[in-house]
Regions:
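Short proline/glycine-enriched turn/loop motifs at strand-loop junctions of beta-rich domains
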Residues: 49-53, 89, 154-162, 252-258, ...
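Sec-dependent N-terminal signal peptides of Gram-positive bacterial secreted proteins and lipoproteins
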Residues: 6-29
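Substrate-binding/active-site clefts of carbohydrate-active enzymes
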Residues: 361-537, 555-566, 570
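The feature marks proteins involved in alpha-glucan
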Residues: 30-49, 73-147, 189, 195-248, ...
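C-terminal beta-strand-rich structural cap/linker in extracellular carbohydrate-active enzymes
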Residues: 253, 294-296, 828-848
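Loop/helix patches that line or flank the sugar-binding groove of alpha-linked glycan CAZymes
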Residues: 651-812
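Short, surface-exposed alpha-helix to beta-strand junction/turn motifs within ectodomains of secreted
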Residues: 53-63, 152, 156-179, 257-272
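Active-site-proximal helices and loops of the catalytic beta/alpha 8
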Residues: 39-41, 76, 272-279, 424-425, ...
Length: 848
């Protein structure tokens, strides 16, 4: 919206008076200008006693981006912020949070905006937004059911529990005690134990003498083991089950007292037909529609307490534009021609994989790509495309490079791109899950038709398979885009996420919420989802974003489930040690790798060892000038199998992804520009090639970021998740310029694929067949005894001058890599037991 720039003289005078009187706090002070193009608010916030956190506000107009605002003043109620935003909004959302995204409550909404102005009051730990200043007189804030025999009542101020009669309508009280036994009888938090078992579908009135009644709400009981055991549903029919004769629906919503199926003839319909669902087993609700329901749109409505909410089916497999409604489809009709469910390239050991990480849009969006379907699934399928100077682009480029697996950044339905306005450039990595089992619509040629995205994604997978490339999907089960507005939370509030002790969403992910994989139905959802993608889309692997949020038992169950489909499916993830309320020994992180066989972890130790920490942009590593890094590089070369307990517990090379760059953080080229600004491009090219040489001759599973082969740059952008195409696109002009460097990477890949010595399949092999030999400072050299009497010497020189390496014998030695060229065929032969390794270069020699 346009901002009015010219103000009348009286307005200027009024603004001047406001500034002069700013110490006087009332709504008069923000009544600045009657301007329908702005919205002005005062937000009052009362912190908990003893608070030490630095809270601020994250605020957004409805359907607009958010911005951070500080509290600017303080009065007798607490802190306050005066905020003015562009736009005439009827609703404004806000979160009380820290800069680290720890939250005090979830999303709150200001809805009393009149003439562009509003004033509200909020209390820490209380989700309610008050339109007038809350009274300091005693009142009940909330009453939560925390077990099947326990209700916790919280009041706004402490009171003497011996002086007030407390009752719960419809249930007998066994005893009443302070929540904190050390607080005495004067407290603002009371624990009530009931005689009878509490019915979670029922709402109870809590009464404290002379106070207004309060209804109970579901609390910690929903996260209890007893709840899980009572309501776990193990069936395979959640979501909709379609046949031409009828479609059945099953929803898991055990705390709902009523549930309805809402059907829509068109995706754009605002009002649907409501059909009462029947209670089923284990907290499920069912409905059946006769006849062929193909093309029907639907949602669910549930009544929890006295409130109805509507949400998309979490198990939905097709959806409307922007994923706001589920859709019934015949999945068999979405298969492309010649689709074969189990047809895929041959693949034996995880260590044989060379993974290439790619964003669908990045591959084709540049005008020079020569690809017609720019930014689409179908763009990945185009063959014979050419770029500047006739270089191969798109699919042909990837195939020519020689990698084995293409790993796609999120291709499930995510929330951060508006599928109705695709004529406007929009970009996002996609780590904003909305519908986990639905393909992203912005990559399809028609997001309005639910089947198109399904068919086109299958065409992409089919084409990659036909070109001897396997497909890995990046999955993001660790959080949802907006927890409070998610289908998980609307349908079963309090269950699918982890919570802090104060009832706020846990935030180990750093994006506002953590899902709770340790709970049975969240675990089941993850297993069901992964196996659905593996079977329906014939996928070959899964990368788990922030895997350390999950528990290792869930990951093992997923490994077990995909083994039954195809044991060659690879699983890997980010096993970071994240601050989420889950016991350390249960986390699916690097420290617990020994408990997770068949699941690989990104090895940040070799990543940072090679180039310097990703959290210290100017810190160097082995390749760019840091000394005494040899031992760290050796551990990376041997797949980290001998790490101590503080850095790794890898038991097998299949558990390690060796990498130096990914979509996160600076590209290696951009990092080198930061750490070595005094070096020219030719020197940085040698550093970059040295890194590639180490990665592709190390044990474990090598992982490459798309464009790494032509030294990709994002122009210094270390977090390009929503940056424009000009930053994120694959630059085919650069590909043409860096042709020699691409050939070098191709040669390294060819070498690795030809000789199994570089991809051993056990720790025992590595320990007995890889031996480090003497080498000068800032140099690592070793020998490998391969199969078929193959014997190699490898040397990596990070010095600025050539070094001499003594070889185990006089050979003759075939030189396969010399820092300038690489491949599986000899460049030349050396008849000597000494070799000069040039500055910032690698040598690979094979005994003839």
């Amino acid at each position: 919206m346009q901002i009015i720039k010219r103000l009348i003289n009286k307005t200027v005078l009024l603004l001047t008076l406001i500034v002069m009187l700013s110490s006087v706090f009332s709504f008069q002070s923000v009544k600045a200008v009657s301007n329908s193009k702005t919205t002005e608010m005062i937000i009052h916030y009362k912190e908990k006693l003893g608070n030490t956190k630095d809270w601020n506000l994250w605020l957004w107009g409805e359907n607009a981006n958010g911005t951070s605002y500080e509290f600017t003043g303080e009065d007798e109620f607490g802190k306050y912020a005066k905020i003015k935003i562009d736009g005439d909004y009827n609703r404004v959302g806000f979160i009380v949070r820290t800069n680290e995204w720890e939250k005090d409550g979830g999303d709150r909404w200001i809805e009393n905006i009149k003439d562009g102005r509003a004033e509200v009051w909020i209390l820490s730990g209380d989700e309610k937004v008050y339109n007038s200043k809350p009274s300091s007189d005693l009142s009940i804030q909330k009453a939560t059911i925390d077990s099947f025999h326990e209700i916790t009542v919280t009041t706004n101020v402490p009171f003497n529990i011996k002086e007030k009669k407390i009752e719960i309508e419809g249930i007998k009280i066994k005893n009443i005690t302070p929540y904190d036994i050390n607080s005495g009888n004067i407290t603002n938090k009371v624990k009530i134990i009931t005689e009878q078992k509490i019915d979670l579908k029922q709402t109870y009135k809590v009464k404290i003498e002379n106070l207004a009644d309060t209804n109970t709400e579901i609390g910690q009981v929903i996260r209890s083991e007893e709840f899980d055991n009572l309501f776990y549903y193990g069936g395979n029919d959640l979501g909709n089950t379609y046949t031409p004769q009828h479609t059945k629906f099953r929803l898991w919503a055990p705390t709902a007292s009523e549930a309805k199926l809402v059907t829509y003839k068109k995706w754009s319909d605002k009002i649907g037909a409501e059909i009462n669902m029947q209670q089923g087993e284990k907290g499920t609700w069912t409905s059946e529609l006769k006849g062929n329901q193909k093309g029907l749109f639907y949602t669910y409505k549930v009544k929890i307490g006295d409130k109805w909410t509507e949400a998309v089916d979490p198990y939905v497999r097709a959806a409307s534009v922007n994923g706001d409604k589920g859709a019934v489809v015949n999945l068999e009709e979405t298969n492309p021609k010649k689709w074969k469910a189990n047809k895929k390239p041959k693949f034996k050991n995880p260590e044989d994989a060379i993974i290439y990480e790619l964003h669908v849009r990045d591959l084709s969006i540049q005008s020079e790509s020569g690809i017609k379907q720019k930014g689409k699934y179908l763009g990945v399928t185009e063959k014979g495309t050419k770029g500047p100077e006739g270089v191969k682009t798109g699919l042909d480029h990837i195939k020519d490079l020689g990698v084995t697996h293409v790993q796609f950044l999120p291709i499930f339905d995510y929330a951060s791109v508006n599928e109705e306005t695709l004529n406007e450039p929009q970009y996002n990595w996609g780590y904003d899950p909305k519908n986990f089992n639905v393909p992203e619509g912005s990559y399809s040629t028609n997001p309005y038709e639910p089947t198109v995205r399904i068919t086109e994604l299958k065409q992409m997978v089919q084409t990659l398979h036909d070109n001897n490339l396997r497909v890995v999907m990046d999955v993001v089960y660790n959080h949802m885009y907006n927890a409070a507005e998610s289908n998980f939370h609307k349908l079963v509030p309090g269950y699918y996420y982890r919570y802090n002790e104060d009832g706020t969403f846990a935030n180990g992910t750093g994006v506002g919420n953590d899902t709770a994989s340790e709970r049975k139905m969240m675990r089941k959802f993850m297993i069901d989802s992964v196996t659905y993608w593996a079977k329906e889309y014939n996928l070959d692997g899964f990368r788990f974003d922030l895997m350390g949020i999950h528990d290792y038992e869930t990951m093992n169950e997923i490994r077990k489930a995909v083994n039954q489909i195809d044991p060659s499916i690879i699983l890997h993830g980010e096993g970071w040690d994240l601050n989420t309320p889950l016991a350390a020994e249960l986390k699916a992180n690097q420290k617990n790798a020994e408990k997770m066989k068949g699941i690989a972890h990104f090895n940040d130790n070799i990543r940072d060892g090679l180039k310097g920490s990703v959290f210290e942009e100017k810190e160097n590593g082995f390749i760019n000038g840091k000394e005494n890094m040899e031992d760290r590089i050796k551990k990376g070369i041997t797949a980290g199998i001998d790490y101590d307990t503080n850095s790794s517990t890898y038991q097998d090379p299949e558990q390690v992804l060796t990498y130096v760059e990914a979509h996160d953080n600076h590209t290696l080229w951009d990092k080198l520009e930061l750490t070595n600004p005094g070096d020219n491009d030719e020197v940085r090219k040698q550093m970059h090639k040295l890194s590639s040489s180490i990665l592709l001759t190390s044990q474990g599973i090598p992982f490459l970021h798309a464009g790494q082969e032509f030294m990709r740059t994002k122009y210094g952008d270390h977090n390009s998740y929503k940056s424009p195409d000009s930053i994120n696109q694959m630059d085919w002009l650069r590909r043409a310029t860096f042709n020699n460097e691409v050939d070098y990477m191709k040669g390294l890949i060819e070498l690795r694929k030809k000789y199994s010595a570089f991809r051993m399949t056990s720790a025992a092999q590595i320990k007995t067949q890889v031996s480090f030999i003497g080498a000068p400072k800032n140099t690592v050299a070793y020998t490998i005894e391969g199969n078929k009497n193959e014997y190699f010497t490898v040397a990596h020189n990070a010095n600025r001058e050539a070094v001499e390496i003594t070889l185990p014998s006089k050979g003759p030695w075939k030189v396969l890599v010399d820092g300038k060229q690489a491949g599986s065929k000899p460049l030349y032969v050396v008849h000597d037991n000494k070799i000069k390794v040039p500055a910032l270069s690698s040598f690979v020699l094979k005994l003839k």
